[in-house]
Design a protein with these regions (language model features):
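Ribonuclease/tRNase effector modules and their secretory precursors
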Residues: 1-74
Length: 74
């Protein structure tokens, strides 16, 4: 799964260290998605699916994480 630049920027802003490298943040996002996924929901009208984890919600399009949302947003 690819991680977009916007998703990395949002992750740095909300959760991770701001000085971390892109590769380190990609590993961290992938690890959270693989190990602690709560649920996945597909939205037919937009073609997106969202992956809920305890730390964040990953919004995905075409196999790529587009953005990161806080866990309390829908």
């Amino acid at each position: 799964m690819k991680i977009g630049k916007h998703a990395i920027r949002r992750y740095k802003k909300r959760i991770g260290k701001r000085t971390a490298t892109r590769e380190r943040i990609e590993k961290d996002i992938k690890k959270h998605i693989e190990t602690s996924t709560i649920k996945k929901v597909y939205y037919k009208e937009t073609g997106q699916y969202r992956i809920w984890t305890p730390k964040f919600i990953a919004v995905c399009e075409k196999g790529m994480v587009v953005t990161i949302l806080p866990p309390n947003e829908n």
